[in-house]
Design a protein with these regions (language model features):
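A short alpha-helical cap/connector motif
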Residues: 1-116, 120-267
Length: 267
């Protein structure tokens, strides 16, 4: 029996997504695919260290040309995700287990230059992944979050519920409720620089200005979970969400010179 989620990953990684095939997509995500944008960040920024949670096929991991650490509970590599890298550390673990068992500095002594967080699609998991990754950040670290800008409410539930979808195009998509990271970071970490790029299929969030010494989210963790656990995008209202968190045109910041102005860099 085919796995609907595997079909989704295959669709995304082949980059066959046409923003015009669904009104819900074309209206809100007309930019560069998240896949191509991540590749461009690697090529332009040339990070010296890379960290990824939620690797699965290894398609985005393959972009890294530097020392890399990758975490996924079940790797499903397609092709060679290592390439010419001399150091790649693979951990087939849940991200919580990775952070409880390992010190990321052991593998990335100078911290994380660039990170892509695309793990479990429940907001508390992404929140913990963000908290734990920020501990290894420096002033110029760039952290990207996937699936935080769903095109409709059907794909934004905690449960997949494929059988109750009405949008033909997004019927097998699942972003989960990680969209909640946007109001959480806005309310609890206004010091961060957060941009939402209109990258199909479900947006790409770029976070900069990180502070490895911040304990704000850790101290507020229980409060955050209690506040957001039972909120759905239906009762939050997707129109309100889109008003509060408008997207940035990813095409404006795709060319190397413009992308350099968008991202911070180590000198």
């Amino acid at each position: 029996m085919d796995n609907p989620q595997s079909k989704l990953w295959s669709l995304q990684y082949q980059i066959k997504i046409n923003p015009n095939v669904s009104p819900s997509i074309s209206k809100f995500h007309q930019g560069i695919s998240y896949y191509d944008y991540l590749k461009q960040i690697h090529q332009v920024r040339k990070p010296s260290s890379y960290f990824e949670i939620g690797v699965e096929t290894g398609a985005t991991l393959a972009f890294a040309q530097c020392r890399a650490v990758a975490v996924d509970p079940k790797f499903q590599f397609q092709g060679n995700p290592i390439g010419r890298r001399t150091e790649t550390y693979l951990f087939q673990l849940k991200s919580d287990d990775f952070f409880s068992q390992h010190d990321l500095k052991k593998f990335l002594p100078d911290g994380v230059d660039f990170a892509f967080l695309d793990g479990m699609h429940h907001f508390e998991y992404l929140l913990r992944d963000f908290i734990n990754t920020e501990k290894y950040s420096h002033k110029d670290t760039v952290v990207t979050l996937h699936d935080c800008y769903p095109v409709n409410t059907e794909i934004a539930n905690r449960d997949m519920n494929y059988d109750h979808r009405t949008d033909v195009v997004t019927r097998i998509w699942w972003a989960g409720d990680v969209w909640k990271l946007l109001p959480i970071l806005r309310d609890f970490r206004p010091d961060l620089d957060v941009a939402v790029l209109d990258c199909p299929p479900t947006g790409l969030v770029v976070v900069q200005g990180l502070d490895p010494n911040s304990d704000t989210l850790i101290k507020a963790y229980d409060e955050i979970i209690a506040k957001y656990r039972d909120i759905t995008l239906e009762n939050y209202k997707i129109e309100q969400f889109r008003t509060e968190f408008s997207t940035t045109d990813s095409r404006r910041f795709f060319q190397p010179d413009l992308l350099k102005n968008f991202l911070t860099f180590r000198i």
